[in-house]
């Protein structure tokens, strides 16, 4: 992976990342294709309608079904999905933690029960990389020990100890596998844990900074803490993060979260919010968000957002979308998802432009002004 820090405006950064499958600028938002597809969309939508340069797939889900071996047989995620740009795969640890009842965390890994058939599995630092080698993802995430917030200081310390231990195991294993010709062209990111505890976050960041990861992620946020505490945690981490590696805030978040954390030096984001909210009838716009199911939109000839150039806003009215939603027409999911993802990707583009023009502060002021804040 090639990484270039191109420009800074305060702590906000524009970087260029090149993988084996695409080159993209940051700040970047990565649409989430949990099971190998962004819900209701296909590779053509992602490339030609949205021009997404990188998307995320989930190791937990793809490992359980169709299995990593099946994906490998199709030539990895790129051959399986026909999306020929970059893929980032998470380790599956979050889903093992959140979807599996009675998951157990040990120093060896995470034992969990499949939400599909109840079978038991063990994720270890090595096994999650083995699955991601099969996927041939461009960026692989290591296994980390996530805790729900609030958590006791003792549990947070255990989480950081395990995450550092697993990071060492993962980076050593990855280098050994590359020496054997496996994982060539695949990159590996470490994940910083520590809850909202300043000292534990710092300890984890400093430890992972010493390891030869291609990038560093901030995990374990947006899991119950107040937004202000998340922003403070990210800002406090900034001095301890290597400036010459990508910074990825996992699972975040709202448009406001993206703006606030870009201001604090974050480069990469992913979240299911644009597509999940789309399926529930909620649209993100330059002036805030609203739900299309309200009666006021039944005879509304206006498009979702007059300033938007997405496929949906170029072609369809609020009245039509209101009808599709109430009729439970599957077409609605695609049209709504196209709009919301276009909004997020365009937000990232506008932030890049503002940073390059040294006008991010003004951009942020206008962003909130349009929302009446």
Curated annotation (Swiss-Prot):
**Which Gene Ontology CC terms are recorded?**
cytosol
> Which processes are annotated in GO (biological process)?
queuosine biosynthetic process; tRNA-guanine transglycosylation
Residues where substrate binds: 90-94, 144, 193, 220
Q: What class of enzyme is it?
A: transferase
Q: Explain how, and how many, cofactor molecules are bound.
A: Binds 1 zinc ion per subunit.
What residues does Zn(2+) bind to?
308, 310, 313, 339
Q: Write the record's keywords in alphabetical order, separated by commas.
A: Glycosyltransferase, Metal-binding, Queuosine biosynthesis, Transferase, tRNA processing, Zinc
Pathway in which this enzyme or protein is active: tRNA modification; tRNA-queuosine biosynthesis
Identify the EC number(s): 2.4.2.29
Q: Which metal ions or organic cofactors does this protein require, according to UniProt?
A: Zn(2+)
A GO MF label: metal ion binding
Q: Does the keyword section mention Zinc?
A: yes
Span list, region RNA binding:
251-257, 275-279
**UniProt function note:** Catalyzes the base-exchange of a guanine (G) residue with the queuine precursor 7-aminomethyl-7-deazaguanine (PreQ1) at position 34 (anticodon wobble position) in tRNAs with GU(N) anticodons (tRNA-Asp, -Asn, -His and -Tyr). Catalysis occurs through a double-displacement mechanism. The nucleophile active site attacks the C1' of nucleotide 34 to detach the guanine base from the RNA, forming a covalent enzyme-RNA intermediate. The proton acceptor active site deprotonates the incoming PreQ1, allowing a nucleophilic attack on the C1' of the ribose to form the product.
| Assembly, per entry | Homodimer. Within each dimer, one monomer is responsible for RNA recognition and catalysis, while the other monomer binds to the replacement base PreQ1.
- HAMAP family per record: Q_tRNA_Tgt
Q: What is this protein called?
A: Queuine tRNA-ribosyltransferase
Taxonomy of origin reads: Bacteria, Pseudomonadati, Campylobacterota, Epsilonproteobacteria, Campylobacterales
């Amino acid at each position: 992976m090639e990484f270039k820090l191109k420009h800074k405006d305060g702590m906000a950064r524009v970087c260029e990342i090149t993988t084996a499958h695409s080159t993209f600028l940051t700040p970047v938002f990565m649409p989430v294709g949990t099971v190998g597809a962004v819900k209701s969309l296909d590779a053509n939508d992602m490339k030609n309608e949205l021009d997404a340069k990188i998307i995320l797939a989930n190791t937990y889900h793809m490992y359980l079904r169709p299995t990593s071996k099946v994906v490998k047989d199709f030539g990895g995620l790129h051959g399986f999905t026909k999306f020929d740009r970059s893929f980032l795969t998470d380790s599956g640890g979050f889903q093992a933690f959140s979807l599996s009842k009675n998951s157990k965390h040990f120093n060896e890994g995470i034992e969990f029960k499949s939400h599909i058939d109840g079978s038991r599995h063990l994720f270890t630092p090595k096994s999650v990389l083995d699955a991601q080698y099969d996927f041939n993802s461009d960026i692989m995430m290591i296994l980390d020990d996530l805790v729900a917030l609030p958590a006791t200081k003792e549990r947070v310390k255990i989480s950081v100890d395990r995450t550092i231990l697993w990071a060492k195991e993962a980076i050593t294993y990855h280098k050994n596998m590359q020496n054997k010709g496996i994982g060539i062209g695949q990159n590996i990111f470490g994940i910083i844990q520590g809850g909202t505890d300043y000292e534990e976050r710092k300890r984890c960041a400093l430890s992972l900074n010493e390891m030869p990861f291609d990038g560093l992620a901030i995990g374990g946020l947006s899991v119950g803490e107040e937004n202000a505490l998340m922003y403070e945690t990210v800002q406090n981490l900034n001095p301890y993060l290597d400036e010459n590696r990508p910074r990825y805030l996992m699972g975040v978040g709202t448009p406001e979260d993206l703006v606030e954390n870009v201001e604090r030096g974050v480069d990469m984001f992913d979240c299911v919010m644009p597509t999940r909210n789309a399926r529930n009838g909620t649209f993100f716009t330059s002036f805030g968000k609203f739900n299309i199911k309200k009666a006021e939109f039944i005879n509304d000839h206006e498009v979702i957002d007059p300033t938007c150039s997405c496929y949906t806003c170029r072609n369809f009215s609020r009245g039509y979308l209101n009808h599709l939603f109430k009729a439970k027409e599957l077409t609605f999911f695609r049209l709504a998802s196209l709009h919301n993802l276009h909004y997020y990707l365009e937000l990232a583009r506008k932030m890049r432009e503002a940073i390059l023009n040294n006008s991010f502060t003004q951009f942020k002021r206008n962003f909130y002004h349009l929302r009446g804040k």
